[in-house]
Design a protein with these regions (language model features):
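Glycine-rich, histidine-containing beta strand-loop boundary motifs that form or position
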Residues: 39, 67, 115, 173
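Two-metal-ion RNase H-like nuclease active-site motif
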Residues: 62-68
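Charged catalytic cores and adjacent phosphate/nucleic-acid-binding surfaces used
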Residues: 1-26, 32, 44-53, 57-58, ...
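Caspase-like (clan CD) cysteine peptidase catalytic core
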Residues: 92-94
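Substrate-recognition element of Asp-dependent hydrolases with the DxDx(T/V) motif
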Residues: 37, 108-119
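Conserved beta-strand positions
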Residues: 37-40, 113, 145-148
Length: 203
């Protein structure tokens, strides 16, 4: 199954320009079977899909609930929790990465750095946490090894780190506007219909 694993919606991200229904339409046209909604410190994009679209349209397309969390010491992280888990703390930005990791794993979820070697103040690879102890990468479950918004050199650096620390590799567009949607993907060998399915495959 082909998923875009980094998507920002108008309903959930202040800088998102595309409504989630339009997102789904574009991805379906491009041959995708699913997406991870990963708005900034918010589940509102996913909530809109759940409350207004789910079960009524696009029933052959999988929408997974995620979040791009802004830590106070290690950049941005993609987080996926099992369905039904609702920790409000993830919509309050600013936890240190150590606490975020403990919280996510305590709830049975997974996390990994978004654009890990990208823009300086948003990326784990630029943080003092990583520079002082690169092996901290082993505490995560995956790494965004390809991000459409980053230059090839940065993506290659991410792929190298993922393979060094034996982390699952995600590809995502990190799209905020229509022309970026579907410019990256992650291929899953087994069917994914829920967040728990995804977590099981990554672990």
């Amino acid at each position: 199954m082909k998923f875009d694993m980094h998507c920002h919606t108008k309903e959930g991200s202040l800088d998102g320009k595309v409504e989630i229904e339009e997102y789904i339409r574009i991805l379906k046209e491009k041959g995708y079977q699913g997406m991870l909604v990963s708005d900034h410190n918010s589940y509102n994009g996913y909530r809109y899909w759940r409350d207004h679209i789910k079960g009524k349209k696009y029933t052959d397309f999988v929408v997974l609930k995620g979040i791009e969390y802004d830590t106070n010491n290690a950049g941005h992280f993609l987080v996926i929790l099992p369905e039904g888990v609702k920790p409000r703390i993830l919509e309050m930005r600013g936890m240190p990465v150590e606490l975020l990791t403990r919280v996510v794993h305590a709830y049975g979820g997974i996390l990994g750095p978004a654009h890990p070697f990208g823009e300086k103040y948003l990326s784990f690879g630029s943080s003092k946490k990583y520079q002082r102890n690169p092996k901290i990468m082993q505490e995560f479950d995956f790494l965004e090894a390809y991000n459409s918004c980053e230059v090839e050199e940065r993506n290659q650096e991410a792929k190298k780190a993922a393979r060094k620390y034996f982390l699952a590799e995600f590809g995502g567009s990190d799209s905020h506007k229509a022309d970026c949607i579907g410019t990256a993907y992650t291929e899953f060998r087994e069917p994914i219909h829920t967040e728990s399915d995804l977590i099981e495959q990554v672990k």
